[in-house]
Design a protein with these regions (language model features):
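Primarily marks hydrophobic transmembrane alpha-helices of the MFS/SLC 12-helix fold
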Residues: 81-84, 107, 280-281
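C-terminal membrane-cytosol helix-exit motif in multi-pass small-molecule transporters
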Residues: 177-197, 382-387
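C-terminal transmembrane helical hairpin of 12-TM major facilitator-type secondary transporters
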Residues: 278-322
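Cytoplasmic helix-loop-helix junction between adjacent transmembrane helices
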Residues: 110-149
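Helix-breaking motifs and short loop linkers at transmembrane-helix boundaries and internal kinks
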Residues: 47, 79, 100-106, 244, ...
Length: 421
């Protein structure tokens, strides 16, 4: 196993390494979300209904939520560099399989594998990003990884959808394969070889990663992401039915949200460095107020556009703080916990979409914003309590570490919240 070279201390390779991790996240984010834009094409070519084709979205989410932590658990003793390029290699193979087949069952399998590798890569990449930089810069480092995903929604997904519509959905997957190959080579060349950043044993990692303080923070994340996506999943329908816009104007409004989200992730990294726990509380309160405002101004297109921009900034701006907080609270189990954080984000998205769907069917599309703002207000006491009462454990050097590798992403990551008065 390789040992840490602590490149973040010298800064000689940190920038290119973080950019490479962001590139990998961009490719993975594109692959996850582009399926929505080509779903009808796949349904037609594979002779299934659009509803059945939607299983490709479910399969990917299942891979992230279940497969990601499982893969992390069985590979916990491997070096981070090896895991990153191996994950990209498997991701490349899975998408190559998707590009080469017209069998729906094979596509589902490819999506499950891709999702599992997605969970592994994002968890390892975010923990490694925090490990590569000095204290005080780790929020921005984690934001680079999640920023890659955010940028994919603005650039990768629209381009991938366009390729699918003009050439064919297999060409979209072929493009993902090509981009993955670039990210793979860049990872081999530019990402430092770093060994494990916590205890080598699965039992020790799991004991810290599944500690009550971490599970409580994951629960907060589920509420924050789930509440947002209860509304966002049906935003296009909301804009058409409530705001009264259609066609290209809806796309423009969604683009406003997407660009704001990308900006929010990168900006959110700086706030995470200043205080991740505090940032989550402020973001939670802001989201509750923004969604309340959207409920009252939803029929006014101009004010709705402003609300969407602020929502995107804040809603995605909290993600680096959430992930960094999870890593911090896990202490020596930060590597495994990082994957749990990524899984919680996707579980929140899936759960929010499901509950939002129930609201649409039962009460109409205008109810999803009310549902989302209600969840935000319900989450606020939990977010505040987590920020005040949950504290990272003390640093624990382990037998697998030398004096040069005892620094972990967790021990440097986030300030301990103030002790209760």
């Amino acid at each position: 196993m390789t040992t840490s070279t602590q490149p973040g201390r010298s800064g000689t390779r940190t920038g290119p390494a973080l950019a490479t991790l962001a590139l990998g996240a961009f490719v993975i984010g594109t692959a996850e979300l582009v399926i929505v834009g080509i779903l009808n094409l796949i349904a037609k070519d594979t002779d299934v209904s659009v509803g059945t084709a939607g299983l490709l979205v479910t399969a990917y989410a299942l891979g992230i939520c279940v497969g990601g932590p499982l893969l992390t658990a069985v590979t916990i003793k491997l070096g981070r560099h090896l895991l990153l390029w191996s994950a990209l290699a498997v991701f490349l193979a899975a998408n190559a399989l998707a590009a080469a087949t017209s069998a729906f069952g094979v596509l589902v399998l490819a999506r499950v594998v891709s999702g599992a590798v997605h969970g592994l890569f994002i968890g390892v990449a975010s923990a490694l990003a925090a490990h590569l930089v000095p204290p005080g810069q780790q929020g921005r480092a984690v934001a680079m990884v999640f920023g890659g995903i955010a940028v994919s929604t603005v650039i990768g997904v629209p381009l991938g959808t366009l390729v699918g519509q003009q050439i064919g959905w297999q060409a979209t997957f072929a493009g993902i394969v090509a981009l993955t190959a670039v990210a793979l080579v860049a990872t081999l060349v530019l990402v430092p070889r770093v060994g494990i950043t916590g205890p080598a044993g699965l039992g020790s990692q799991a004991r810290h990663a599944f500690a009550p303080r971490v599970l409580a923070q994951l629960g907060v994340g589920l509420l924050l992401l789930g509440g947002q996506f209860a509304a966002f999943t049906y935003l296009a329908s909301y804009l058409e039915d409530v705001t009264g816009i259609s066609g290209g104007v809806v796309s423009a409004f969604l683009l406003v949200y997407g660009v704001a989200s990308a900006v929010g992730v990168f900006g959110g990294g700086r706030f995470a460095d200043r205080g991740a726990a505090r940032t989550l509380v402020v973001a939670n309160l802001a989201l509750a107020l923004i969604l309340t405002a959207l409920h009252f101004v939803g029929k006014n297109p101009a004010l709705t556009a402003v609300a969407l921009a602020v929502w995107g900034l804040v809603g995605f701006g909290l993600v680096p703080s959430f992930q960094l907080r999870v890593i911090s609270l896990a202490g020596p189990g930060g590597d495994l916990a990082a994957t749990l954080g990524a899984s919680a984000v996707n579980a929140g998205i899936a759960g929010g979409a499901a509950v939002g769907g129930w609201a649409v069917e039962s009460h109409g599309v205008d109810s999803v914003v009310v549902l989302a703002l209600t969840v935000m207000f319900v989450a606020l006491p939990a977010t505040w309590a987590a920020s005040r009462w949950l504290r990272p454990p003390a640093a624990e050097p382990t037998p697998s570490e030398t004096p040069d590798t005892t620094r972990t992403a967790a021990t440097d990551a986030v300030e301990a919240p103030p002790r209760p008065a």
